[in-house]
Curated annotation (Swiss-Prot):
Quaternary assembly: Efficient DNA binding requires dimerization with another bHLH protein.
Miscellaneous field: This protein is synthesized as a Gag-vMyc chimeric protein. The sequence shown here corresponds to the Myc homolog fragment of the chimera.
Gene Ontology cellular-component terms listed: host cell nucleus
CDD domains (alphabetical): bHLHzip_c-Myc
Record protein name field: Viral myc transforming protein
UniProt cross-references to PANTHER family, sorted A to Z: MYC PROTO-ONCOGENE
Annotated segments matching region Disordered: 144-174, 203-268, 315-340
One Pfam family in the UniProt entry: Myc-LZ
SMART domains: HLH
Listed Polar residues bias regions: 315-324
Length: 416
């Protein structure tokens, strides 16, 4: 059910009921959705549980806001300044709303359902559906703008109020209306608490309880700062698949009359540009074996390639050296084994020779090395004692010889 923002609704009690969305989409949009699913050449076939979403397409409805016109109906018969400003805002706000949002509320809910399905099930088909829906809505909106442009320019503004009534009645009614409006706004429920996602950017922020009621009418709209616009652009670059770039600046003046404000408050429209942002969607196949390949940017890839080339060169240089080193190690091992075998053989032969020199174990071929060493030690000690004894005997014999020589000389001299 499209929302008509160009004509103001006089019955404000039922105005909020009229904007409640239907539970299901219109037949036309469902046919488009089914047709988009049946075309399987360019789009991915739907997920097995994609049709279940039709049962869950009801939007959460917040409780109705309190009436804003109950006390004003019997208070005054003439529109006050606040009423006139609100009517002008509604008349001029339609173009701004249609300019900033291509789809009407039902179409917005349809697009959001596609986005929800994109997040949960089919990533490729939902992107193409969303792109087609936005393109069609853009074409219809531009056609309606071209047809309705001259008519909107020639349409006169709301009739100015008649001669000023006595100051007591309108002032009292305006003050009463502002008071009721402030109380109603304080009693309203913030839609962000009820809705899981923001419906649109035109939803006003919740006013603090002590705010001025005149500021709640939305007479002046402060321009968005550069930081907010940069944050919105960053969010759009990160999330959106189709982005609408538009530059519109609207300035409203409350000091002039209603006709002058209508002439000055017409926004300067710029042509809408439909940007197609390519989003890389990688679906991970959990059944496939894990791949160790990692993709890097161009600069990092060049660095890695150069590093790999250097590593390959160094590896090529080292390719021959491991072989030579292995051969050298094998040669060293062979020579070491040969030398060790020779040493053991020599040691065995020396033990055999030592065993042959010891009389106690000379005939024992199975004598262990420890026994051979012990017997050899004992034999060496005995030989040393024999040596000392023989040396002492030799010394005695030498002295005896000297004595005998001396006696022989004495005998020779005595005979002469």
């Amino acid at each position: 059910m499209p929302l008509s923002a160009s004509l103001p609704s006089k019955n404000y009690d039922y105005d909020y009921d009229s904007v409640q969305p239907y539970f299901y989409f219109e037949e036309e949009e469902e046919n488009f959705y089914l047709a988009a699913q049946q075309r399987g050449s360019e789009l991915q076939p739907p997920a097995p549980s994609e049709d279940i979403w039709k049962k869950f397409e009801l939007l959460p409805t917040p409780p109705l806001s309190p009436s804003r016109r109950s006390s004003l109906a019997a208070a005054s018969c003439f529109p006050s300044t606040a009423d006139q400003l609100e009517m002008v805002t509604e008349l001029l706000g339609g173009d701004m709303v249609n300019q900033s949002f291509i789809c009407d509320p039902d179409d917005e809910s349809f697009v959001k359902s596609i986005i929800i399905q994109d997040c949960m099930w089919s990533g490729f088909s939902a992107a193409a559906k969303l792109e087609k829906v936005v393109s069609e809505k853009l074409a219809t909106y531009q056609a309606s703008r071209r047809e309705g442009g001259p008519a909107a320019a020639s349409r006169p503004g709301p009739p100015p109020s008649g001669p000023p009534p006595p100051p007591a009645g309108p002032a009292a009614s305006a003050g009463l209306y502002l008071h009721d409006l402030g109380a109603a706004a304080a009693d309203c429920i913030d839609p962000s608490v009820v809705f899981p996602y923001p419906l649109s950017e035109r939803a006003p922020r919740a006013a603090p309880p002590g705010a001025n009621p005149a500021a709640l009418l939305g007479v002046d709209t402060p321009p968005t700062t550069s930081s907010d616009s940069e944050e919105e652009q960053e969010e759009d670059e990160e999330i959106d698949v189709v982005t609408l770039a538009e530059a519109n600046e609207s300035e409203s003046s409350t000091e002039s009359s209603t006709e002058a404000s209508e002439e000055h408050c017409k926004p300067h429209h710029s042509p809408l540009v439909l940007k197609r942002c390519h989003v890389n969607i990688h679906q991970h196949n959990y059944a496939a074996p894990p791949s160790t390949k990692v993709e890097y940017p161009a600069a990092k890839r060049l660095k890695l390639d150069s590093g790999r080339v250097l590593k390959q060169i160094s590896n090529n240089r080292k390719c021959s050296s491991p072989r030579t080193s292995d051969s050298e190690e094998n040669d060293k091992r062979r020579t070491h084994n040969v030398l060790e075998r020779q040493r053991r053989n020599e040691l065995k032969l020396s033990f055999f020779a030592l065993r042959d020199q010891i009389p106690e174990v000379a005939n024992n071929e199975k004598a262990p090395k420890v026994v051979i060493l012990k017997k050899a030690t004992e034999y060496v000690l005995s030989i040393q004692s024999d040596e000392h004894r023989l040396i002492a005997e030799k010394e005695q014999l030498r002295r005896r010889r000297e004595q005998l020589k001396h006696k022989l000389e004495q005998l020779r001299n005595s005979r002469e």
